[in-house]
């Protein structure tokens, strides 16, 4: 999501190809082998950059994992409309402009996969459904996903951003028919939002579904002090950041992240990501600078003890369900 084109996405997107490839190459050289993107990110430009990176550096295809997503529209003229309607809770199927341009119908899944493979220039290792679609039957969704795997264009399927009961419905449908099931769940989970720990995460852990949460740093809020006056382009313009709600323990959590980061002489970002890794997650991190990559890599070697974990989690208070925009 961090790479693409400002015109098609957000002002904080990195669009200079040399800088993008510099970060991706640094990640690859450091041992990072999984790259997560989506067809909607910058109207497909993000996927194109992943494909260009592989070809530019002649990366052996078998050495990396490419994850992409389908659900949303990709046409440049429809993305802003889609984002606006989604943020206001408007039913997407009520918009004639979005007919057959988004959702999880068999037609749209097939079209989305075909276009993503073309932009990437290769197959997709893990195709994730970006959202749950209440207007398409579980049978249609899971059969279509099974068929794109059987076609060879996709190797595995994953899910993202949905309620526990919705995920269960889809998994059970696939199991009933002997179709391919989801191997991963990309949900919203971090120190400021832990509602997924009630049902989704225990289920995934019990059934062997990999957890790869998005926004482990809560849209960057876990990277700076509560008293910091720093305002980034993203914090001022990001639709999702403005939609977040926090519990009564929000300030205490940030304060404790800052305190422990100083104790271990690491950044707050490193500390917060280390917590995510400790919970058994494999978080998706967005990187726009090489220095931020170093913060993420440092989290792998930072081992928090149980006292640290308890101290960080203690102030948490329940909050409304989020992350489904």
Swiss-Prot record:
Keywords: Oxidoreductase. Its EC number is 1.1.1.-. It holds the Pfam family Aldo_ket_red. The keyword RNA-binding does not apply. It is an enzyme of class 1 (oxidoreductase). GO terms for molecular function: oxidoreductase activity. InterPro entries: AKR_Detox_Biosynth, NADP_OxRdtase_dom, NADP_OxRdtase_dom_sf. PANTHER family: ARYL-ALCOHOL DEHYDROGENASE AAD16-RELATED, NADH-SPECIFIC METHYLGLYOXAL REDUCTASE-RELATED. Belongs to the aldo/keto reductase family. Aldo/keto reductase 2 subfamily. This is Putative aryl-alcohol dehydrogenase C750.01. It comes from Schizosaccharomyces pombe (strain 972 / ATCC 24843).
